[in-house]
UniProtKB/Swiss-Prot annotation:
The active site is at K68 (proton donor). This is Orotidine 5'-phosphate decarboxylase. Homodimer. Belongs to the OMP decarboxylase family. Type 1 subfamily. Its EC number is 4.1.1.23. The lineage of its organism: Bacteria, Pseudomonadati, Pseudomonadota, Alphaproteobacteria, Hyphomicrobiales. One of its GO terms (cellular component) is cytosol. It is an enzyme of class 4 (lyase). PANTHER family: OROTIDINE 5'-PHOSPHATE DECARBOXYLASE. Catalyzes the decarboxylation of orotidine 5'-monophosphate (OMP) to uridine 5'-monophosphate (UMP). One of its GO terms (biological process) is 'de novo' UMP biosynthetic process. Substrate binds at residues 17, 39, 66-75, 121, 182, 191, 211-212.
Length: 237
């Protein structure tokens, strides 16, 4: 079972996968109090969006910096040290042992939680085979989850399809953050391992990352409210 002390609104993380800072700020204003947690990934970060993390934290929001760090240990450590000053709640690294160890050690006294990305939700067994892996998705996710927990990583980024299995492996304390969330009737897009918000929560997800179903909705605020309501209903709140 996922940790129970997270407000329903904060279980929804809206991915600000937008082209520039101005557009992202406008979306945050439009969503208002309906959203309390935002993700800043490659697109916005590389368009000058990292300062938005500080602004959001200053406004009482939570921030997930999703840069999926992966390099030699020293380089990862220096990156984590720099990014920890943004005040973010979450920071992602790829789930390779040296990368995870460096990130956990470099975090120091900051409050940022290190999340390990197991296998991207756009990958399936065939994609892994094409990349030279001898494991399928399920086995690779499980192996990386066990390594992450042993190293002291705070949580995992995984497909909602793996959430129930992983919850049984890592127990109730680790955060499970699941992209690949699509409300009923929404297009899958480039995601291959997807699930509705209610089913993901029931499977043991702690947080749901949602981008296009909110950002591209005719009324993004209403779309976010509907997802939070679905989360609350799934939890019996």
């Amino acid at each position: 079972m996922a940790p129970v002390d997270i407000p329903d609104r904060d279980r929804l993380i809206v991915a600000l996968d937008l082209p520039d800072l101005r557009v992202a700020e406008a979306m945050v204003d439009r969503l208002g109090d309906s959203v309390g947690f935002y993700k800043i990934g490659y697109q916005l970060a590389y368009a000058g969006g990292l300062p938005l993390a500080r602004a959001l934290v200053g406004a009482g929001k939570k921030v997930f910096v999703d840069l999926k760090l992966h390099d030699i240990g020293n380089t990862v450590a220096r990156g984590v040290e720099s990014l920890s000053h943004l005040g973010a709640s979450f920071l992602t690294v790829h789930a390779y042992p040296q990368t995870m160890k460096a990130a956990v050690e470099a975090r120091g006294s900051s409050k940022v939680k290190i999340l390990a990305v197991t296998v991207l939700t756009s990958y399936d067994d065939r994609d892994l085979a094409d990349a030279g892996y001898r494991f399928g998705v399920r086995d690779l996710v499980e192996a990386r989850a066990r390594q992450a927990q042993a190293i002291g990583v705070d949580g995992l980024v995984c497909s909602p399809e793996e959430a129930a299995h992983l919850r049984g492996i890592v127990g109730p304390e680790m955060d499970l953050v699941t992209p690949g969330i699509r409300p009923a009737g929404a297009a899958a897009g480039d995601q291959k391992r997807i699930m509705t918000p209610a089913k993901a929560i029931a499977a043991g997800a702690s947080y749901l990352v949602v981008g296009r179903p909110v950002l591209d909705a005719p009324d993004p605020k209403a779309a976010a409210d509907a997802i939070v309501a679905e989360i609350a209903a799934a939890r019996g709140s």
